[in-house]
């Protein structure tokens, strides 16, 4: 379940972690849609609908609940914490468990084969790509964790460097990342991470203007539903793992993320 840390705490009672029901609901729904979306063929209208928001929504919701550090010391602590929480488990599962599993399942038990398997897995984690392309292997599901780690790192760094121009800078970074992804995949899924920065920013802005959004919940939902439905019908969607992002419609996937999440928020 999703929780946010309350800022105030007293000596007699520590700060409590408060649940946000609509975010828990949104994340649970997106998890189901991840499974459903990967069972549908390309070009399917339902697949376009799911991919129009389900992965960006995860980052959007992360930005909503995240609290960016306001000091360099806090930034360093956050990077260490995220690395331990997101990257270390991947290294343990993919690079250790998978290597040993593939080695013992193979007929070749030589050290040379063990080295080849370990080297291949190391290459997949170096690129951390969700899809293979031009000799770059796919690491599968862990691409999401690498994109989240580096996306949060860049997002928090930009918050320290540009505290007053957050939205504009995030938008520029997103455009740059989307463009690079069409030309050349970057190691560690960094081109996707730059796109993720915008979704994190949108989630933060959503939280900051919560009172206003509460007043116009239904009109907001209807206003976002129209372009969202039109783009889905036209087959315009975003698939971060395969860098399926159009520079022409790069702003629309950002609306998708907000739309998909706010739809659940509006009806909650």
Positions of predicted regions on the chain:
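Alpha-helical transmembrane segments and their immediate juxtamembrane cytosolic regions
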Residues: 2-268
